[in-house]
Amino acid sequence: MAELRWHPLIQDWVMVASHRQDRPQMPKDWCPFCPSGGRVPDYEVLKYDNDFPALLQNPPEPDPVANDFFKVAPAYGKCEVILYSPEHTITLPELSDSHIRKLVDLWTERFEELSKDPKIKYVFIFENRGEVVGVTMPHPHGQIYGYPFIPKKIELELKSCREHYEKNNECLICRMLKEEKEFEQRVIFENEDFTV
């Protein structure tokens, strides 16, 4: 079962995907994301469709658990895995600058491609690591989800940006960056392109 359920308390959609509980624990001596494992070709970076997606291009009809108050919707969308490297134990910070460039190019390509689907309203690129958050694959990877809705937190951020602009005639993100740079206490790194 994969469906979206409206959560009236937080006024946001929640993904329900019971089939994800069936994800296997991989043997310690085999990894499907390593080229030698036989599931993926040789690669530097690779897009791989998630074997256990929470969102589907052809979702089933939701279970009959809805009424006027508890709404459900098909779990339309796309879930992709982005393999960072064929090296099984490397982490993102250990990748070379040129390799990270290839990864960013792939993220950009996938973002642009998923954004062409009129049913996808938000594209989320992320990495989660460790068994504690449910990661079953230790191989270095991230994910991209194409949501059929804009998550509430993102709606709030957009609303804050609009309201700040209407009130102050300036970009809120630009103002935050300006304040951080002037305050200096929280800036970790800065160059001509980025401030962290």
Tell what function each PLM region has.
Residues 1-139, 145-196:
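Active-site microenvironments that recognize anionic phosphate/pyrophosphate groups
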